[in-house]
Amino acid sequence: MPLCKTYYVNAETGRDSFDGLSEATAFASLRAVNRLTLQPGDRVRLACGSVFAGQYLHLTCCGSKDAPIVVGAYGDGPAPRIDADGQGIWYQDYGCPLDSPTHVYRGYVSSAVLLYDAAYVTVQGLEITNHSGAILGESYSQPDKMERTGVAVVAKDKGTCRGITLRDLAIHDVNGNVYDKHMNNGGIYMTALSPADEAATGPARFADVLVEGCYLYRVSRWGLAVGYTYAHAHFQGA
């Protein structure tokens, strides 16, 4: 069984050319973390006081029930801050039209943190924002405004995604699209998308999800939403 690793990231003193395996050889950016292939039991620790401006954390890794992957903080000072600033763009597609022709079901989304087909992953003790400031011509209620999320959690091609924990996160100033209610907009948003091969993987869904101690404010459209599923037709009238 491989040994678990702890990776350190310090925006002020780190370098992405380092190995990230000690505080003295910390990475500098989340780009280095996104390139890792994290294994069960691995840890990613962001230095307190670090601000990761224009960066994002997108993970597709799976821990295990006995050895989750944990992303958190280390050191003294303010919580590490991920400020996506409209970056971290990915494509959301339910794989089928939704229950109303006016509901947008696919398009590009900006997420500061994205857990995509991840399992047994804990994210804790971070500050997260995703506000692009004053974009020329963009208003609060603009219909084609960018879809933005603080934390997006997606199930698609791994069957049941288990063991996601979001703990003690301060998520704020996420100015998403207030019209596209089934897209990943707001503080925390979870969705199940149509699998490429449902016969092989089973339905896309979640189990054993825990959200605790999180503080969300100035987020739109939603604060916390377990949003929608490609299998909505099975639940009509429920």
Residue ranges and their predicted role:
Residues 9-47, 52-53:
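Acidic Gly/Asp/Thr-rich repetitive segments characteristic of extracellular carbohydrate-active
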Residues 5, 42, 55, 67-69, ...:
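The right-handed parallel beta-helix/beta-solenoid scaffold, focusing on the short coil/turn
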Residues 18, 34, 55-56, 132, ...:
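Activation segment
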Residues 62-144, 168, 173-179:
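Right-handed parallel beta-helix/beta-spiral solenoid domain characteristic of secreted/periplasmic
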Residues 1-2:
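Mature N-terminal, pre-catalytic/accessory segment of carbohydrate-active enzymes
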Residues 12, 47-49, 62, 73-76, ...:
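Beta-strand repeat scaffolds of extracellular/surface proteins
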Residues 68, 72-77, 119-130, 159-175, ...:
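Right-handed parallel beta-helix
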Residues 56-59, 89-114, 137-157, 179-206, ...:
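Extracellular beta-strand/beta-solenoid scaffold signature
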